[in-house]
Amino acid sequence: TLTMRGNVSPVAEANVACDPQACDQVFTSGMDITVVGLDVTMRTRLKMEHLDWLSGCCKPACRPAVDYMRQAMVHYLRGNQTQNYCMGDCPLHDPLAVMCAVTPSLVRTESRKARVECGGTYCRGMIVTDLREHPFQAEYVRFAVEVDSERAVRELMSVFWE
């Protein structure tokens, strides 16, 4: 995440915090990557109303997946209310990353020189970008900074309906 707080620590998001060294290796590899982080995934949310609507119009072959998503949403919302005091929806973290790989126009990106803090007690897993005129030595990494969240949710749901 560039501008948001973390979701597993004050500064780190789960997919980076679980293995910051691996993430830093990817960032420094020179590969052409786009990071779809909390800056955009927290703004792209699936609601139970979306799943209720899908239940009424999904393809028969998709019924088991939609039923599973409804059950998972109930479980997710219960845990999220307990831990984070959030209610009513589910950020589309990994689904949005996959959708952006297929449809990059869902997001606007910015390139920044970036590294991942691999040590530290409080900042382990934090993505560090250097915006100074002469930034530290690092590769440019593309970060999703804006998202068309309504379009993303519609595109996700369109896979399931007839």
Annotated model-derived regions:
Residues 1-28:
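Active-site glycine-rich loop that binds ribose-phosphate moieties when present
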Residues 14-17, 33-162:
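Conformational coupling and interaction surfaces
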